[in-house]
């Protein structure tokens, strides 16, 4: 009897192993300014891609970008490499480069040229850190890696050092690349670009896809002070033959392009862009034959549009809600296409975001939070006082300021035997008086700190020992540098660092895990899924998804 039971158990084990399909394709979806509640608040309304992802996923409820400057470049870098952005040298979307003596774009490449259309050549040439795609290719040179994004830095940091290609929107009418990656675009990409026909959208109107009652229940009223209003044609003077706009503040649906605006230049700001982004992703899967063999492939997709919409209207707006409902539909079509082209049983999906975001400050009281907008005038005044006093005591040009970050001339400090602490105290004296500034810190103070709280850890993970600013201001919780309208991100606080993170696969039981996870955990977890070993000292850990 025991022998029979043993044989039955062995048979069940073999059947189980036979049903475990190999992973042929990794789909890495990265939102921009997406918060976890964009999944949870609208979960009952989702019918497409988000619904499928959630129903077949393990969701990490306590997932964070564990670094202190939460913007697009560093966030995508952390996801794509498994390395914190500070040690990796990705100090922001733009930052002061001490060697060059100027502010640089994080993915600029002066030696490269645009490929496929007019635009700016970008690449990862400033960094040597390998990405997840490089690690996959190191293990299997026949694997293919494609990275596509609305923003250049999204596509580039997700793609790593050696993708087959990185494609990004040129803010005109096409997806382009640079000579760092290729000398020419594949013909199917050129054909797709030629057929996008963005000018046809010039009269398109963004309307809600559900009745008003749903938006009142799941978001807030449409007109809300603090939202950005770019569209003014709805209230211009119809009797004015010059069609001169009155620019009346009216941030409500419907939304469209103002008269005379080239749709291509603002297309990334609209929900229609996602249709083009995932359309390009579909033809990439087909023409590059991704997932067609047993050499695992990677497709990274940077969903950049949501950042523009959330900057303009905030995470609780009707516009944000409608955007995610529309993206749900687009994702649903994309997942259906993948099922037909590859088979969902062979695909691992990962969804996360480069950072979260603060609700519009004017809405914070409704959430029981305090906040506001730092006065540009007060900041300007403080900067002038700082410059005047430091120049008077130590001479001109002792530092370079980039935003609220101060880079000192270390050679002059050493030559004149000046301790950095002394001019730093001048900066602290004036900036600490500005309403909305929580603290003024030095790089050395952060690195020397023994504190183990989340804020200190995140600040440390954003520091590069040589390249980072010497002194910088830490904004107060709930405050923005952005003035007048809209919202933003960039702080080390939970509303900016807390991001969605899920791993989805057909048949996986939907469940939530509440223990701490980080975006740098994505790379080692993908490697574990693919049974790939790496000698790289990754900052992340393998997450329990099986």
Language-model region placement:
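Active-site-proximal N-terminal segment of extracellular/periplasmic enzymes that hydrolyze or transfer
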Residues: 18-58
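Substrate-binding rim/cap in mid-to-C-terminal beta-strand-loop elements of soluble/periplasmic
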Residues: 377-418, 488-530, 544-546
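Secreted, luminal/periplasmic, and some membrane-associated catalytic domains
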Residues: 62, 93-119, 161, 173, ...
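His/Asp/Glu-rich, glycine-adjacent segments
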Residues: 84, 92-295, 304-311, 435-436
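Non-catalytic, well-ordered alpha-helical segments in soluble enzyme domains
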Residues: 52, 129, 133-137, 403-440, ...
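A long, amphipathic alpha-helix that forms part
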Residues: 267-293, 306-347, 424-430
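Short, solvent-exposed turn/loop segments enriched in Gly/Ser/Thr/Pro and often Arg
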Residues: 61-80, 147-157, 302-304, 353-356, ...
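Bacterial Sec-dependent N-terminal signal peptides
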Residues: 1-22
């Amino acid at each position: 009897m025991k022998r029979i039971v043993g044989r039955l158990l062995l048979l069940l084990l073999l059947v189980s192993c036979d049903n475990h399909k190999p992973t042929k394709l990794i789909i890495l979806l990265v939102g921009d300014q997406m918060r976890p509640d964009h999944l949870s608040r609208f979960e009952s309304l989702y019918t497409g891609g988000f619904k499928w992802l959630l129903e077949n996923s393990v969701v990490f409820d306590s997932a964070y970008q564990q670094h202190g400057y939460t913007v697009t470049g560093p966030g995508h870098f952390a996801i794509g490499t498994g390395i914190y952005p500070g040690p990796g040298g990705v100090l922001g979307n733009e930052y002061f480069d001490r060697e060059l003596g100027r502010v640089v774009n994080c993915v600029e490449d002066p030696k490269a040229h645009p490929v496929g259309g007019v635009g700016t050549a970008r690449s990862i040439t400033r960094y040597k850190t390998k990405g997840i795609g490089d690690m996959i290719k190191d293990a299997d040179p026949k694997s293919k890696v494609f990275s596509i994004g609305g923003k250049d830095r999204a596509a580039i940091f997700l793609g790593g050092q050696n993708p087959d290609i990185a494609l990004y929107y040129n803010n005109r009418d096409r997806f382009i690349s640079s000579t760092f990656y290729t000398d020419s675009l594949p013909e199917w990409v050129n054909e797709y670009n030629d057929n996008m026909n963005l000018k046809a959208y010039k009269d398109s109107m963004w309307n809600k896809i559900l009745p008003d009652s749903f938006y009142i229940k799941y978001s807030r009223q449409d007109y809300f002070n603090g939202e950005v209003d770019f569209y003014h044609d709805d209230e211009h003077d119809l009797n004015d033959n010059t069609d001169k706009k009155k620019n009346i503040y009216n941030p409500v649906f419907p939304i469209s392009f103002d008269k005379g605006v080239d749709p291509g230049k603002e297309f990334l700001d609209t929900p229609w862009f996602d249709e083009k982004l995932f359309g390009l992703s579909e033809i990439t899967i087909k023409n590059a034959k991704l997932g067609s063999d047993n050499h695992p492939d990677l497709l990274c997709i940077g969903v950049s549009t949501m950042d523009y919409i959330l900057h303009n209207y905030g995470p609780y707006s009707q516009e944000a809600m409608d955007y995610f409902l529309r993206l749900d539909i687009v994702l649903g079509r994309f997942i259906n296409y993948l099922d037909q082209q590859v088979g969902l049983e062979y695909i691992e999906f990962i969804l996360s975001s480069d950072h979260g975001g603060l609700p519009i400050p004017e809405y914070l009281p409704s959430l029981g939070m305090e906040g506001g907008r730092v006065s540009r005038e007060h900041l300007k005044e403080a900067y002038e006082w700082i410059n005047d006093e430091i120049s008077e005591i130590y001479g001109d040009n002792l530092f370079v300021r980039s935003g609220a970050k101060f880079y000192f001339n270390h050679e002059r400090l050493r030559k004149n035997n000046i301790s950095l602490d002394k001019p730093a105290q001048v900066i602290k004296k004036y900036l600490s008086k500005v309403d909305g500034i929580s603290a003024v810190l030095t790089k050395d103070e952060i690195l020397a700190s023994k504190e183990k709280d989340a804020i200190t850890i995140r600040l440390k993970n954003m520091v590069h020992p040589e390249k980072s600013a010497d002194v910088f201001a830490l904004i107060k919780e709930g405050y923005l540098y952005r003035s007048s309208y809209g919202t933003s991100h960039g702080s080390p606080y939970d509303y900016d660092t807390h991001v969605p993170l899920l791993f989805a696969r057909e048949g996986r039981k939907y469940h939530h895990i509440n223990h701490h996870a980080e975006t740098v955990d994505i790379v080692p977890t993908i490697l574990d899924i693919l049974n790939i070993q790496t000698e790289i000292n990754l900052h992340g850990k393998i997450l329990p998804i099986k």
